[in-house]
A protein has these predicted regions:
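Structured non-transmembrane domains adjacent to transmembrane bundles in polytopic membrane proteins
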Residues: 17-174
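Signature of alpha-helical transmembrane segments and their immediate interfacial
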Residues: 1-23
Length: 174
């Protein structure tokens, strides 16, 4: 038991000092072609993380437009757009080309696009996503949000559980 406790103490100290990060681009050499290209897109065109929101297509244009307005008020959201927020409730979508409708409304869902000023993998964007998910679920309990920010947030949550489980089992094995 004494040996176990002596070995356990360094494990606990090391674990508490280990910083886990998920901004993978920051950990790579900044002169890599992909990193340079991504940085250039951000600088030249203001490219920011985009959130792709899917809500059921039985929501009215007014409901979707109202949701877009609420999402615009979330800290760090720079713009929100959907077919309904552009056309309004009285617009006949049959006038639009099928190719446009396949992107914006198909498979039983409507697409909403929201851009964020926050960097992916940070506490700020994770908090932003939590607020957005709350707003979306108020309108459509089965609505979903995806994109780089949401997927990284999911990765963080899953990896955190995995790391904790591996640590516990590793300590127990020792």
């Amino acid at each position: 038991v004494a040996i176990f406790i002596l070995v356990l103490v360094p494990f606990i100290v090391a674990q508490s000092k280990t910083e886990v990060y998920y901004t993978l681009f920051d950990s790579l050499p900044q002169d890599l072609v992909g990193i340079v290209g991504t940085n250039k897109l951000g600088e030249d065109f203001g490219m920011t993380p985009s959130h792709f929101i899917l809500v059921h297509d039985d929501l009215t244009a007014t409901q979707v437009s109202d949701l877009c307005d609420e999402l615009k008020d979330v800290d760090g959201i720079t713009q929100v757009v959907s077919l309904d927020s552009i056309t309004g409730p009285g617009f006949d979508t049959e006038l639009l080309p099928d190719s446009v409708m396949e992107i914006l409304q198909s498979g039983g869902y409507k697409l909403i696009l929201a851009n964020s000023s926050y960097k992916t993998g940070t506490d700020a964007i994770n908090s932003q996503l939590d607020k957005m998910i709350g707003l979306i679920k108020n309108v459509d309990p089965e609505g979903v949000i995806t994109g780089e920010g949401a997927m990284t947030k999911d990765l963080i949550e899953v990896a955190d559980v995995d790391f904790k489980n591996v640590n516990v089992w590793s300590i127990m094995a020792v």
